[in-house]
Curated annotation (Swiss-Prot):
This is Melanin-concentrating hormone receptor 2. One of its GO terms (cellular component) is plasma membrane. Keywords: Cell membrane, G-protein coupled receptor, Glycoprotein, Membrane, Receptor, Transducer, Transmembrane, Transmembrane helix. GO terms for molecular function: G protein-coupled receptor activity; neuropeptide binding. Receptor for melanin-concentrating hormone, coupled to G proteins that activate phosphoinositide hydrolysis. It is found in: Cell membrane.
């Protein structure tokens, strides 16, 4: 993503409901739950759907696919799977928490959402390490930095994400609360289970990958600026690291890191705070809703960041558009010939 993508963070409402007791009543749905939040996330996801399809289409249609392209394509696919599952959760929110799609679909949607969260974190981390070796240590691990092996690495990350999400496949189900509402929720048996699972999810998908990602990009920036200063001090007429490239790389990294932190951190902080609260306050609800919107907004922002911050995507889009147009014209000509 970007190298940072958070479109893939698990913001499903069921994880905030502390559903360790099946008799725990689902709170009366407010206008925010049933109208405002579903509408906002619906708009955000619609935009993200278009943007991520554009990214995947651009990469697939490109003749020369690079190693970063494979990582970005996988992140965009994860965003798409995540966004496609959102209408079901939006429908549940709009109906005041009622789930009408049955138990199997509840398990599938919730589990894929969590699997995508693990996958996004893993892909972002590995891609950051790959960028470090490509720019700072270009002659190391070259045998692993091929398109074929990068595809295998990404498949391995998806498989590992599926395994890490096994608790969700087991415990996500339709729960009937005492007010009669049947909701798709994560059914844990005790507050301790909720505590340990929240810590497990937060650490593995945010607090563990974040330092690795930051270290990789800090080292990349330090190396790039060091090379630029060396060339500048040597007064090279044609420096290998021009100032424009350094500034562009710095700006891109700062933007992507900022988007990652701003979109993911609030939700995970809210989840940790929720563990200590017996009765959520109005401020907590406001923060929770904002964290959800920020998490899903990243799914819409990331594709456009790829396009705006990457010169390769800006060059590829017109080329692919011309190729598609030429192909359509050729097909139309063949069709006309067949009629005469």
């Amino acid at each position: 993503m970007n190298p940072f993508h958070s479109s893939c963070w698990n913001t499903s409402a069921e994880l905030s409901n502390k559903s360790w007791n099946k008799e725990f009543a689902y709170q009366t749905a407010s206008a925010v739950d049933t109208v405002i939040l579903p509408s906002m996330i619906g708009i955000i996801c619609s935009t993200g759907l278009v943007g991520n399809i554009l990214i995947v289409f651009t990469i697939i249609r490109s003749r020369k696919k690079t190693v970063p392209d494979i990582y970005i394509c996988n992140l965009a696919v994860a965003d798409l799977v995540h966004i496609i599952g959102m209408p079901f959760l939006i429908h549940q929110w709009a109906r005041g928490g009622e789930w009408v799609f049955g138990g199997p679909l509840c398990t599938i949607i919730t589990s894929l959402d969590t699997c995508n969260q693990f996958a996004c974190s893993a892909i972002m981390t590995v891609m950051s390490v790959d960028r470090y070796f490509a720019l700072v240590q270009p002659f190391r691990l070259t045998s692993w930095r091929t398109r074929y092996k990068t595809i295998r690495i990404n498949l391995g990350l998806w498989a590992a994400s599926f395994i890490l999400a096994l608790p969700v496949w087991i415990y996500s189900k339709v729960i009937k609360f005492k007010d009669g509402v049947e909701s798709c929720a994560f059914d844990l048996t005790s507050p301790d289970d909720v505590l340990w699972y929240t810590l497990y999810l937060t650490i593995t998908t945010f607090f563990f990958p974040l330092p690795l990602i930051l270290v990789c990009y800090i080292l990349i920036l330090c190396y790039t600026w060091e090379m630029y200063q060396q060339n500048k001090d040597a007064r090279c007429c044609n420096p290998s690291v021009p100032k424009q490239r350094v500034m562009k790389l710095t700006k891109m990294v700062l933007v992507l890191v900022a988007v990652f932190i701003l979109s993911a951190a609030p939700y995970h902080v809210i989840q940790l705070v929720n563990l200590q609260m017996e009765q959520p306050t109005l401020a907590f609800y406001v923060g929770y809703y904002l964290s959800i919107c920020l998490s899903y907004a990243s799914s819409s922002i990331n594709p456009f960041l790829y396009i705006l911050l990457s010169g390769n995507f800006q060059k590829r889009l017109p080329q692919i558009q011309r190729r598609v147009t030429d192909k359509e014209i050729k097909n139309m000509g063949n069709t006309l010939k067949s009629h005469f």
